[in-house]
Amino acid sequence: MKQEKHGVLLVNLGTPDAPTSSAVKRYLKEFLSDDRVVDTAPLIWWPILNGAILPIRSPRVAKLYQSVWMDEGSPLLVYSRRQQRALAARMPNTPVELGMSYGSPSLAEAIDKLLAQGVTNLVVLPLYPQYSCSTSAAVWDGVARILKGYRRLPSVSFIRDYAEHPAYIAALRQSVEHSFAEHGQPDRLVLSFHGIPKRYARLGDDYPQRCEDTLRALTATLPLAPERVMMTYQSRFGREPWLTPYTDETLKGLPAQGVKHIQLICPGFSADCLETLEEIKEQNREIFLKAGGEKFEYISALNDEPAHIDMMQQLVAQRF
């Protein structure tokens, strides 16, 4: 009887290959063409995407990427690679590969590498702590689509999410408490999650509930009164209503309520990226300070912190 061999596929969203208009355009086209992300009918959406959004947004977004690009590359890819290497070091007998839903390294490349190493039991870990149809489900679709091309399939274990997992909450708590120790306790701790259209939630996506589960679990562990911890949603796109309260509008209004010092963490982002380093750390910081705020500290994503890798190892080991 052939011995089973486990392998791990870490998945994140993806990133352009370079901070250029052409690279950003390629990436955005792939990303925004996924009907899990934008479910508008193709006959309506494609002319909008190709005729307006890509030509207008690509140069603008490229400039934003240039402001956060690291020597090693895109922050999301840099931190994701570090996560992969750190987890692989913890599990020397288990192949660990990284794949992105959009861009490079692709899911197909990662799965090919794992199966070429004889993996018979594949554990898929989408690095989205809170399930959403637009992220986690898109990973499911991608993995299934790729495996359809194989005659011999591995067993597949798919980790839906980990919004309340004790090791995840412990890693967040450690990060927040480190910030408190360095900067003092803020008037408000803001948890900013990526938003989704309200319509997606009405149609059954339980993402808002999973964000609230994380908020509740983390708040219970912190040395801060619950009324001083709040949740918002960022990165809205398009004209239809998204989940509220919006992060930027909330930060603009807080100083008028006497809130002068905030610390902000983005628990839904497993690695720092454009949305955290530019949108939050730069744009939203400026919004808060211009509105009369005095102190703003961004608490980094968990990235490759040891507690985060501990969590990944626990999640994966539970599927072996």
Swiss-Prot record:
<protein>
    <recommendedName>
        <fullName>Ferrochelatase</fullName>
        <ecNumber>4.98.1.1</ecNumber>
    </recommendedName>
</protein>
<comment type="pathway">
    <text>Porphyrin-containing compound metabolism; protoheme biosynthesis; protoheme from protoporphyrin-IX: step 1/1.</text>
</comment>
<keyword id="KW-0350">Heme biosynthesis</keyword>
<dbReference type="GO" id="GO:0006783">
    <property type="term" value="P:heme biosynthetic process"/>
</dbReference>
<keyword id="KW-0627">Porphyrin biosynthesis</keyword>
<dbReference type="GO" id="GO:0005737">
    <property type="term" value="C:cytoplasm"/>
</dbReference>
<dbReference type="Pfam" id="PF00762">
    <property type="entry name" value="Ferrochelatase"/>
</dbReference>
<keyword id="KW-0408">Iron</keyword>
<keyword id="KW-0963">Cytoplasm</keyword>
<feature type="binding site">
    <location>
        <position position="275"/>
    </location>
    <ligand>
        <name>Fe cation</name>
    </ligand>
</feature>
<dbReference type="InterPro" id="IPR001015">
    <property type="entry name" value="Ferrochelatase"/>
</dbReference>
<dbReference type="InterPro" id="IPR033659">
    <property type="entry name" value="Ferrochelatase_N"/>
</dbReference>
<comment type="similarity">
    <text>Belongs to the ferrochelatase family.</text>
</comment>
<dbReference type="InterPro" id="IPR019772">
    <property type="entry name" value="Ferrochelatase_AS"/>
</dbReference>
<dbReference type="GO" id="GO:0004325">
    <property type="term" value="F:ferrochelatase activity"/>
</dbReference>
<dbReference type="GO" id="GO:0046872">
    <property type="term" value="F:metal ion binding"/>
</dbReference>
<keyword id="KW-0456">Lyase</keyword>
<keyword id="KW-0479">Metal-binding</keyword>
<dbReference type="InterPro" id="IPR033644">
    <property type="entry name" value="Ferrochelatase_C"/>
</dbReference>
<feature type="binding site">
    <location>
        <position position="194"/>
    </location>
    <ligand>
        <name>Fe cation</name>
    </ligand>
</feature>
<comment type="function">
    <text>Catalyzes the ferrous insertion into protoporphyrin IX.</text>
</comment>
